[in-house]
Amino acid sequence: MKIRPLHDRVVVRRKEEEEKTAGGIVLPGNAKEKPSQGEVIAVGNGRILDNGETRALAVKVGDTVVFGQYAGNTVKVDGEELLIMSENDIYGVLE
């Protein structure tokens, strides 16, 4: 099943969580922080402006983005957890 976001929404696959700290300490599941980076896997058509025109999104499929730890809403598609967020929740694109 595929998911197609509407308007200025973006679907992001969160990066894998770190299992160890930089010092080599293994973290239990509940001590891990949610990663705030991910890969864009789908984008909507764009934001609808007040004059009725549609402005394309600045991010595209395949971009690695940075977002707030609590940004977006989590959904499960085919057993995989994905985030759906507004483009405004994205801080930047890693290059």
Curated annotation (Swiss-Prot):
GO biological process: chaperone cofactor-dependent protein refolding
GO cellular component: cytoplasm
SMART domains (alphabetical): Cpn10
UniProt entry keywords in alphabetical sequence: Chaperone, Cytoplasm
PROSITE patterns cross-referenced by the UniProt entry: CHAPERONINS_CPN10
Compartments where found: Cytoplasm
Family matches, as InterPro entries: Chaperonin_GroES, Chaperonin_GroES_sf, Chaprnonin_Cpn10_CS, GroES-like_sf
Keyword Cytoplasm tagged: yes
Tagged with keyword Transmembrane: no
Pfam family, one: Cpn10
GO molecular function, one term: ATP binding
Function: Together with the chaperonin GroEL, plays an essential role in assisting protein folding. The GroEL-GroES system forms a nano-cage that allows encapsulation of the non-native substrate proteins and provides a physical environment optimized to promote and accelerate protein folding. GroES binds to the apical surface of the GroEL ring, thereby capping the opening of the GroEL channel.
Family named by the database record: Belongs to the GroES chaperonin family.
Protein name as catalogued: Co-chaperonin GroES
UniProt source species: Marinobacter nauticus (strain ATCC 700491 / DSM 11845 / VT8)
Lineage: Bacteria, Pseudomonadati, Pseudomonadota, Gammaproteobacteria, Pseudomonadales
